[in-house]
């Protein structure tokens, strides 16, 4: 008799999506050699957001040495609940999920992708150290090869108030009882010739023969945060070489994640996604909110009079949000009526409310921070409300009014150092007040040409001693990939 195999159906935990180089490349959208940029970008974004939410002008320190990268801030301190959620790999917890807004991190699961990194790049000693709210967490995260589940070790100790930080984050005083310091740590790798390598694909980061392009990219990524955030004071400590960019306007403001979002930024599929997220949350917490309570979350609908008009037009007085689910599906027809009523009784948001970096700040940054010639500095700002047809709802006449603000700045370095690395073209790009790891402006409108091609046409090639900055504030920034390497810009 011919032998027959009765295959067993095996279940693999989705927790494994974070515990290998391949999976983390998928989650972050970046190869291992770019993970140091991912670490800095995500942690500085989180630090700046936390300070803004607390009404504190952010002060952020980025420290890099042979065995670690550390980000420290002066914010309110990472909540224990947020840390615990980031270490639960069975769920995805995010305060950004579902909302449409000009926030720095729309995915909101940055910490979850960062915690497994130390053991992926250094299986023996890699670890994460978090200091916040008077406690020091030494965290190691790995995967059990048999059960394929996450194994999390979090050793917690109180930080004596009289002692300095264990992280050695320069000599800048940081009140760790009210701030957060996160250090990704690995074993130092120094070669006989003095070259120091990081375990991210063997990157040479310090020494005579180190990869200058990497060091330059790392530095420019850090500096980009200061360029696009006038209220930020940024300290950079690269192997003991320190640089500080002071805030030019500590009271500068922008649209915050805690600000109510505008219904004019939503199309039907966006509102359905948000409603579904609220219903799921209410089921998990034993609630069943009214549509009226849901409306309070939106810009221009905090007053009862406006809400009553919306509810009357939509026929949803005393209607519960869960009633918008019929036989296991969202009632798109009723939600479309609700969306139309919400837009009819509110005003679109003016583009200036998103936040404007401003000419004064950029001039000071280009001249004092980067060394550009004052007389060469140029600045441009374009703002508008973009009319986007709502094709999903089937009614092309109805539209979303999406505000946007694009700012650009140019400066000439002078070329006095005869081809030095700092005297080549430097491009800084960002969206929603966060700097980009790669230039995301790959295609403008219908021409298909990107930023570099546009600069080349203006005789500003890669070898020219200039600095160019481009920033877009937009509540519905869309990227072509998870790594945010290409932004979609309509023309």
Describe the residue ranges of each PLM region:
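Charged regulatory segments coupled to nucleotide-binding catalytic modules in large multidomain enzymes
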Residues: 1-6, 148, 152-155, 160-164, ...
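GHKL (Bergerat-fold) ATPase N-terminal catalytic module, capturing the glycine-rich phosphate-binding loop
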Residues: 1-177, 181-182, 294, 298-303
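Charged, alpha-helix-enriched surfaces in structured cytosolic catalytic cores
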Residues: 34-42, 77-81, 105-112, 123-125, ...
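Conserved, well-folded catalytic cores of nucleic-acid-processing
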Residues: 47-50, 89-93, 117-121, 224-229, ...
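Structured core elements
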Residues: 61, 70, 77, 112-113, ...
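Short coil/turn segments at secondary-structure boundaries
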Residues: 99-102, 234-239, 292-296, 308-310, ...
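Accessory alpha-helical DNA-binding modules that contact the DNA backbone or grooves
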Residues: 124-129, 133-136, 277-351
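Prokaryote-biased recognition of long, low-complexity C-terminal linker/tail segments
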Residues: 311, 323-324, 336-450, 460-461, ...
């Amino acid at each position: 008799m011919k032998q027959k195999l009765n295959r067993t159906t095996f279940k693999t935990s989705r927790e494994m999506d974070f515990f290998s180089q391949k999976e983390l490349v998928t989650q972050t959208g970046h190869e291992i050699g770019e993970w140091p940029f991912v670490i800095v970008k995500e942690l500085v974004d989180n630090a700046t957001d936390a300070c803004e939410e607390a009404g504190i002008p952010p002060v952020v320190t980025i420290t890099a040495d042979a065995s670690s990268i550390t980000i420290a801030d002066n914010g309110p301190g990472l909540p224990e609940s947020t840390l615990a959620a980031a270490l639960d790999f069975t769920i995805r917890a995010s305060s950004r999920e579902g909302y449409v807004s000009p926030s720095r991190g729309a995915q909101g699961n940055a910490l979850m992708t960062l915690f497994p990194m130390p053991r992926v790049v250094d299986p023996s000693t890699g670890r994460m150290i978090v200091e916040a709210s008077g406690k020091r967490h030494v965290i190691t995260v790995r995967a059990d090869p048999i059960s394929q589940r996450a194994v999390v070790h979090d050793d917690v100790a109180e930080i004596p108030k009289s002692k300095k930080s264990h992280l050695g984050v320069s000599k800048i005083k940081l009140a760790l009882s009210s701030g957060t310091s996160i250090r990704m740590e690995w074993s130092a790798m120094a070669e006989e010739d003095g070259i120091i390598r990081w375990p991210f694909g063997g990157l040479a980061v310090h020494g005579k023969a180190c990869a200058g392009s990497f060091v330059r990219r790392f530095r420019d990524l850090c500096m980009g945060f200061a360029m696009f955030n006038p209220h930020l004071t940024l300290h950079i400590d690269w192997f003991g070489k320190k640089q500080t960019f002071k805030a030019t306007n500590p009271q500068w403001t922008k649209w915050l994640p805690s600000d109510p979002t505008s219904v004019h930024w939503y199309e039907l599929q966006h509102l359905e996604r948000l409603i579904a997220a609220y219903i799921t949350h209410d089921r998990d917490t034993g609630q069943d909110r009214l549509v009226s309570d849901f409306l309070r979350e939106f810009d221009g609908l905090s007053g009862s009079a406006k809400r009553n008009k919306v509810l009357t037009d939509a026929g949803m007085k005393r209607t519960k949000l869960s009633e918008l689910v019929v036989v296991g599906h969202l009632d798109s027809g009723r939600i479309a009526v609700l969306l139309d009523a919400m837009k009819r009784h509110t005003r679109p948001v003016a583009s200036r409310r998103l936040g404007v970096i401003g000419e004064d700040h950029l001039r000071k940054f280009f001249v004092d921070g980067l060394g550009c010639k004052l007389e060469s500095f140029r600045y441009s700002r374009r703002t508008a409300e973009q009319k986007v047809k709502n094709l999903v709802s089937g009614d092309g006449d109805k539209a979303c009014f999406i505000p946007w603000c694009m700012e650009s700045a140019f400066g000439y370095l002078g070329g006095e150092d005869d081809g030095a690395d700092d005297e080549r073209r430097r491009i800084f790009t960002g969206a929603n007040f966060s700097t980009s790891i790669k230039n995301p402006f790959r295609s403008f409108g219908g021409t298909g040409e990107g930023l570099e091609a546009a600069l080349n046409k203006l005789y500003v090639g890669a070898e020219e001693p200039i600095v160019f900055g481009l920033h877009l504030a937009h509540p519905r920034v869309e990227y072509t990939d998870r790594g945010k390497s290409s932004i979609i810009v309509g023309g």
